[in-house]
Amino acid sequence: MDKQLPVSVWPEWKITEKIGEGSFGKVYKACRSEQGTTFYSAIKVITIPSNPGELSSVRSESPNEQSVKEYFQGLVDECIQEVSTMEYFRGNSHVVSVEDYKVVEYLDDIGWDIYIRMEYLTSFMEYCAGRALSEDDVIRLGIDLCKALEYCQCQNIIHRDIKPENIFVSRFGEFKLGDFGIARELERTMSGLSKKGTYSYMAPEMYKGEAYDSRVDIYSLGIVLYKLRNHNRLPFISLEKQLITYRDKENALNKRMAGEKLPRPAEAGDA
């Protein structure tokens, strides 16, 4: 454990362990006790700027400290906007629920920590470790996430990054969709990337920089389901080879983006 919550954030919550880490933040398991009962949450901590080098880089290209602060304040505002978007989903049984968030500005330098408290869930990757998903499991996953995407569409929200890493499982076995672009939006802004999402599951129109709509999420979910019924291999990746090279992945991606017909998944059931 390498983080403690500032007293001003949620004094009743105590961090117990780190459970995840990405380019722009870390995720911790936290608990609180009340009348003999222990409750758990996941707390994501996003740090802006993410490291001293990032701050130095912006300083070297800015005329003064005020410009530097305004730049990073803009990133904080974007992040808060993304978190606020999650308010639309509170109570939805197929979307990760955000319970609260706090923004803490540094006193000694330019910087912020954004604390986002969410329901504590099992990551899909952890859920799948050591177990083989049956066809019924995959169908249930598809149904649960389609319900999440249906609600997204009603709110005019496009997720744009459907992938196994953004899927979670409740203790009741419900599959839930998470990460509605907080870290992704920061990554796009900081690195100048024009394409959002992950290439492995990305719809061709997004990859090519063309106009797209909510159907890109359905496409990406389809690729996730395809992989789960294809011995964990993406379309056009050989099922015979044990060692998959970077070139193999690039060739498979190029075929998919060119619109070639996808082979039937190895474990596809009868339609």
Where in the sequence are the language-model features?
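Conserved catalytic-loop aspartate of Hanks-type protein kinases
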Residues: 217
